Amino acid sequence: MVREKVKVSTRTLQWKCVESRRDSKRLYYGRFILSPLMKGQADTIGIAMRRALLGEMEGTCITRAKSENIPHDYSNIVGIQESVHEILMNLQEIVLRSNLYGTCNALICVQGPGYITARDIILPPSVEIMDNTQHIATLTEPIDLCIGLQIERNRGYSLKMPNPFEDGSYPIDALFMPVQNANHSIHSYGTGNENQEILFLEIWTNGNLTPKEALHEASRNLINLFIPFLHVEEETFYLENNEDKVTLPLFPFHNRLVKLRKKKKELVFQYIFIDQLELPPRIYNCLKKSNIHTLLDLLNNSQEDLIKIEHFHIEDVKKILDILEKNRKFISN
């Protein structure tokens, strides 16, 4: 456990982790402060952060399981102590950590007798189990058991459908939220017009993210929500998708690309690969799958084109804009 004394700054707004501990493999705790704040600001930030921590965070869960010769999820299998329903409930409790984008498959294939734990799950390299000791099932006889799993990264929760899927797999209720609880409290100090506040944030996570990682991600999510308000109305366009309209800023580097074409210098972009831009793995993989390999490929796509890429979101476009802004040397005249 890490604990620090709280020192109040009288100048620049600062944040600090004042307590950090791991109570178990599936329970992390962090306590943070932000100060100095003017009266009322601590509550504004605290409420927004708590909602973002509990509702906007992405997590990774097992969402489907499939095995041969299972008539229904309340049946029992000879040689297995638990019912199918109990096995599905145990799989629901497995805590995973990943940089996965979308879904992937995993596998359990064991021979009894013996105990099956999370350690027996064969995972892709992008997924990690936080607690290998989590119990799944007990084989009481020398039988072979193979279970195919689907792993998904998402946010919020997903309630299983009452019936199995057409391929015979069984849905599993998924709670994607890595933050188990979040609280904020306020300490006021000073007098009269000089009254100021310290915001205390407490975060509990399941190990999918550490509290500090959760704080950073929630902050980024909040910033992304407010970005559209930083652009004047005339410099935006509307993307219509199934009756939903989304406002996005214009791609600021298109004009620069047009100027370079006039100077016949755009060919240099063919030799700047997106690998050099240090993109997040998920964005990088989506671009690669869409045959976007170079900076020229990227700049030749409008934001409308990018948003149509499978598994691509508005936040990803904004992240690309931020990265391009930081790499102006690649796009200079």
Curated annotation (Swiss-Prot):
Concerning SMART domains, the annotation shows: RPOLD
Primary localization class, coarse:
plastid
Function text? DNA-dependent RNA polymerase catalyzes the transcription of DNA into RNA using the four ribonucleoside triphosphates as substrates.
Q: What is this protein called?
A: DNA-directed RNA polymerase subunit alpha
**Keyword Metal-binding: yes or no?**
no
Its domain description in UniProt is: The N-terminal domain is essential for RNAP assembly and basal transcription, whereas the C-terminal domain is involved in interaction with transcriptional regulators and with upstream promoter elements.
Enumerate the UniProt keywords alphabetically: Chloroplast, DNA-directed RNA polymerase, Nucleotidyltransferase, Plastid, Transcription, Transferase
Q: Which family does it belong to?
A: Belongs to the RNA polymerase alpha chain family.
> How would you summarize the oligomeric state and partners of this protein?
In plastids the minimal PEP RNA polymerase catalytic core is composed of four subunits: alpha, beta, beta', and beta''. When a (nuclear-encoded) sigma factor is associated with the core the holoenzyme is formed, which can initiate transcription.
Q: Does the keyword GTP-binding apply?
A: no
GO BP annotation list: DNA-templated transcription
The record's GO molecular-function terms, alphabetically, read: DNA binding; DNA-directed RNA polymerase activity; protein dimerization activity
Catalysed reactions listed for this entry: RNA(n) + a ribonucleoside 5'-triphosphate = RNA(n+1) + diphosphate
Q: Name one Pfam family in it.
A: RNA_pol_L
GO cellular component terms listed in the entry, alphabetical order: chloroplast; DNA-directed RNA polymerase complex; mitochondrion
Tell me the segments the record calls region Alpha N-terminal domain (alpha-NTD).
1-233
Please name the source species. Aethionema grandiflorum (Persian stone-cress)
Q: Which cysteines form disulfides?
A: none
Top EC class for this record: transferase
- Which cellular compartments is it found in? Plastid, Chloroplast
